[in-house]
Amino acid sequence: MISKEKIARINELAQKAKSNTITDEEKAEQQKLRQEYLKGFRSSMKNTLKSVKVIDPEGNDVTPEKLKREQQKNNLH
């Protein structure tokens, strides 16, 4: 997970970009930080989805087969 300081820096750079006072160096830093943030977010989202079980209104397990295989591989369900 990305630190609070890095998130604050991302937001600071976003404000500078909105006011058109951002330098090329800061743009590169902003891109690097955004990529780091997105990588962590995607990883977290994948882990969350791996623990999901989908049940229809009749109580049947309708979890997609691909997800079931991934869960079995990781011994989650």
UniProtKB/Swiss-Prot annotation:
Region (Disordered): 55-77
Principal location listed in the UniProt entry: cytoplasm
Xref: InterPro entries: DUF896 (IPR009242)
Keyword line: Cytoplasm
A Pfam entry, by short name: DUF896
Subcellular location: Cytoplasm
Originating species: Bacillus velezensis (strain DSM 23117 / BGSC 10A6 / LMG 26770 / FZB42)
Protein name per the record: UPF0291 protein RBAM_017680
GO cellular component labels: cytoplasm
Family: Belongs to the UPF0291 family.
Stretches with biased composition (Basic and acidic residues): 63-77
Superkingdom in the source lineage: Bacteria
